[in-house]
Amino acid sequence: MSPQTETKASVGFKAGVKDYKLTYYTPDYETKDTDILAAFRVTPQPGVPPEEAGAAVAAESSTGTWTTVWTDGLTSLDRYKGRCYHIEPVAGDENQYICYVAYPLDLFEEGSVTNMFTSIVGNVFGFKALRALRLEDLRIPPSYTKTFQGPPHGIQVERDKLNKYGRPLLGCTIKPKLGLSAKNYGRAVYECLRGGLDFTKDDENVNSQPFMRWRDRFLFCAEAIFKSQAETGEIKGHYLNATAGTCEEMMKRAVFARELGVPIVMHDYLTGGFTANTSLAHYCRDNGLLLHIHRAMHAVIDRQKNHGIHFRVLAKALRMSGGDHIHAGTVVGKLEGERDITLGFVDLLRDDFIEKDRSRGIYFTQDWVSLPGVLPVASGGIHVWHMPALTEIFGDDSVLQFGGGTLGHPWGNAPGAVANRVALEACVQARNEGRDLAREGNEIIREASKWSPELAAACEVWKEIKFEFEAMDTL
């Protein structure tokens, strides 16, 4: 060891354990434009001060370990450490705090959501000093955002590819999700598309099972797409799920979809992983495929209010990793989603610049610069009576996806698709004429049903269906 190294390593080194807050709690720190900022909901163990808990989070998610180590002297910890720079109590929740942590940009590999999450949430959630920990939001600086490709195409490019403007897009998940043969599955796709839907969809767990291998499904769905396009004169698509057990197999399925000439494929981005998702997104941009993203497994991570990762963070991560659509709740259907919070992360998916707004759960102003937007998908327990509310809540730049609300129509799949298309067109026309969808929605649907027997039948079937449960994801 050289004398210079010996001197550097030994200066200021004292073995033992010291409080995290002495090094990582820095309330006077002024954040930099290049810092990645995180807002954590921290519940310390009894007797642990919030300053120590916040500093522990900053340390364990950056440069810290449980004891002083002599190699600290070989680098500049002050340059690379995370800093807990602000702490505020959570109103109405005793012994719970929002701790704000700033991370220097040099801690993260460029263009890697995988590395970002491994650093920020990879280890600290098991820390004994904390009873619970939840990552509520991240501020991604433009200097880091620009290292990502993001969505393969984005909202405007997708509309141009589909030649569809001025309304939400309509979709349907094929049911039953498991058990159909490839030919019967393709038949259901064809009926829904010719009835007026823009898209149909593989469910998240449709991959390549014994009853329906992926190649057979792709072939029959492609046939359904091209036949329905010829009949309707509209561009159609089916979300062909390319998710697989290996990245190589996933890419093989995406390549086959491109060779068939279909417009869109699908990926389960949380179960498939961010590395696989980013690879697929790059392939889709290079080869003209749209990419639909399912968030299977998200509620395991984001549903508990005190522990985990909020979906707004997972949504930001998806926009960075890449996807043209992502499921985002419905507010009115069977799946979790409170209105203001849902609209907060919907804006984070679609807009270029989003101001801080704590009333919608947005802790930081986010500037996406030139990163393309993502279409939010409303799916889960919705039907024609929900159409006015969905159109009013999500606006034109969205995908409204009715599975049971299409295939459950008493006259069949195609009439179910007709009912949804008529309901949507009626709501869009009423909105464009200045009518209040929130107040007059039911009347608008009833008026339209006079001219559409398919819609009238759907209205009768689902007139009593409601999902009235209180959302768990509240501010």
UniProtKB/Swiss-Prot annotation:
EC number: 4.1.1.39
Name of the featured protein: Ribulose bisphosphate carboxylase large chain
Propeptide regions on this chain: 1-2
Modified residues (N6,N6,N6-trimethyllysine): 14
Residues recorded as bearing N-acetylproline in the entry: 3
PANTHER family: RIBULOSE BISPHOSPHATE CARBOXYLASE (PTHR42704), RIBULOSE BISPHOSPHATE CARBOXYLASE LARGE CHAIN (PTHR42704:SF15)
Main location as per UniProt: plastid
Catalytic activity: 2 (2R)-3-phosphoglycerate + 2 H(+) = D-ribulose 1,5-bisphosphate + CO2 + H2O; D-ribulose 1,5-bisphosphate + O2 = 2-phosphoglycolate + (2R)-3-phosphoglycerate + 2 H(+)
InterPro entries according to UniProt: RuBisCO (IPR033966), RuBisCo_large_chain_AS (IPR020878), RuBisCO_lsu_C (IPR000685), RuBisCO_lsu_C_sf (IPR036376), RuBisCO_lsu_fd_N (IPR017443), RuBisCO_lsu_N_sf (IPR036422), RuBisCO_lsuI (IPR020888)
Cofactor comment text: Binds 1 Mg(2+) ion per subunit.
Pfam families assigned to the protein according to its UniProt record, in alphabetical order: RuBisCO_large, RuBisCO_large_N
UniProt record similarity statement: Belongs to the RuBisCO large chain family. Type I subfamily.
Gene this protein is translated from: rbcL
Organism (species): Eucalyptus globulus subsp. globulus (Tasmanian blue gum)
Quaternary assembly: Heterohexadecamer of 8 large chains and 8 small chains; disulfide-linked. The disulfide link is formed within the large subunit homodimers.
Superkingdom in the source lineage: Eukaryota
PROSITE patterns the UniProt entry points to: RUBISCO_LARGE (PS00157)
Additional observations: The basic functional RuBisCO is composed of a large chain homodimer in a 'head-to-tail' conformation. In form I RuBisCO this homodimer is arranged in a barrel-like tetramer with the small subunits forming a tetrameric 'cap' on each end of the 'barrel'.
Active site per UniProt: 175, 294
GO biological-process terms attached to the record: photorespiration; reductive pentose-phosphate cycle
